[in-house]
């Protein structure tokens, strides 16, 4: 917050209190970072990034080293960021969790776009299975997934513009655009449901 020259001391304090409340981290405000759980650490990292009022945020492996409940919390935070009009770029090896929050995916291999579509389309693509996922990968609930030891990374690039409409652009390996929320009477419908575009 010290970098926010547009805010005086009281303004910075108000932003701090607002972020602590928004991310449910008021109770850990005086704790050392090493004493936080993985999920608490992720929420603090995201709140810190939002203190600068960004238009775009990078989440580097947000699903790594956190328990399943925290994974759900992080997904909700990602949907919350999108609803606030903040673009999100995610790099993560957790294919299951990342595909679960996307609407459209682009797979690029050796600098060439080899597939695009929703999660089911990507998972059914034989070339994607051959070069990236393997033939055992499944996205069904309760299925134990095999995570392949590769240097590949997932990338989510999301550009928000004009009333929740998304524009997609392929980056290095896999670009995912998050689900678009439906606007109902000026408020967003629940982001955890697949909805038609606005």
Swiss-Prot record:
<dbReference type="InterPro" id="IPR051120">
    <property type="entry name" value="ABC_AA/LPS_Transport"/>
</dbReference>
<comment type="function">
    <text>Part of the ABC transporter complex LptBFG involved in the translocation of lipopolysaccharide (LPS) from the inner membrane to the outer membrane. Probably responsible for energy coupling to the transport system.</text>
</comment>
<keyword id="KW-0963">Cytoplasm</keyword>
<comment type="similarity">
    <text>Belongs to the ABC transporter superfamily. Outer membrane lipopolysaccharide export (TC 1.B.42) family.</text>
</comment>
<keyword id="KW-0472">Membrane</keyword>
<dbReference type="GO" id="GO:0005737">
    <property type="term" value="C:cytoplasm"/>
</dbReference>
<keyword id="KW-0547">Nucleotide-binding</keyword>
<comment type="subunit">
    <text>Component of the lipopolysaccharide transport and assembly complex. The LptBFG transporter is composed of two ATP-binding proteins (LptB) and two transmembrane proteins (LptF and LptG).</text>
</comment>
<keyword id="KW-1003">Cell membrane</keyword>
<feature type="domain" description="ABC transporter">
    <location>
        <begin position="12"/>
        <end position="64"/>
    </location>
</feature>
<dbReference type="Pfam" id="PF00005">
    <property type="entry name" value="ABC_tran"/>
</dbReference>
<dbReference type="Pfam" id="PF12399">
    <property type="entry name" value="BCA_ABC_TP_C"/>
</dbReference>
<dbReference type="InterPro" id="IPR027417">
    <property type="entry name" value="P-loop_NTPase"/>
</dbReference>
<keyword id="KW-1278">Translocase</keyword>
<protein>
    <recommendedName>
        <fullName>Lipopolysaccharide export system ATP-binding protein LptB</fullName>
        <ecNumber>7.5.2.-</ecNumber>
    </recommendedName>
</protein>
<keyword id="KW-0997">Cell inner membrane</keyword>
<dbReference type="InterPro" id="IPR032823">
    <property type="entry name" value="BCA_ABC_TP_C"/>
</dbReference>
<keyword id="KW-0067">ATP-binding</keyword>
<dbReference type="InterPro" id="IPR003439">
    <property type="entry name" value="ABC_transporter-like_ATP-bd"/>
</dbReference>
<dbReference type="GO" id="GO:0016887">
    <property type="term" value="F:ATP hydrolysis activity"/>
</dbReference>
<dbReference type="GO" id="GO:0005524">
    <property type="term" value="F:ATP binding"/>
</dbReference>
<dbReference type="GO" id="GO:0005886">
    <property type="term" value="C:plasma membrane"/>
</dbReference>
<keyword id="KW-0813">Transport</keyword>
């Amino acid at each position: 917050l010290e970098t926010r020259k547009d805010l005086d001391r009281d303004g910075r304090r108000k932003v701090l209190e607002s972020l602590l409340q928004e991310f449910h981290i008021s109770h850990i405000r005086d704790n050392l970072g090493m004493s936080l759980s993985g999920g608490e650490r992720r929420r603090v990292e995201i709140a810190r990034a939002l203190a600068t009022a960004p238009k775009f945020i990078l989440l580097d492996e947000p699903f790594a080293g956190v328990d399943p409940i925290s994974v759900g919390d992080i997904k909700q935070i990602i949907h919350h960021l999108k609803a606030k009009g903040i673009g999100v770029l995610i790099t993560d090896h957790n294919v299951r969790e990342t595909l679960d929050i996307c609407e459209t995916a682009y797979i690029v291999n050796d600098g060439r776009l080899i597939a695009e579509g929703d999660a089911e389309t990507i998972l059914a693509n034989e070339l994607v299975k051959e070069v990236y996922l393997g033939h055992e990968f499944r996205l069904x609930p309760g299925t134990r997934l095999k995570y392949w030891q590769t240097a590949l990374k997932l990338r989510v690039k999301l550009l928000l513009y004009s009333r929740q409409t998304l524009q997609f652009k392929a980056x290095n390996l896999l670009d995912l655009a998050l689900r678009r929320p439906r606007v109902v009477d000026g408020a967003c419908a629940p982001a955890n449901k697949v909805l038609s575009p606005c």
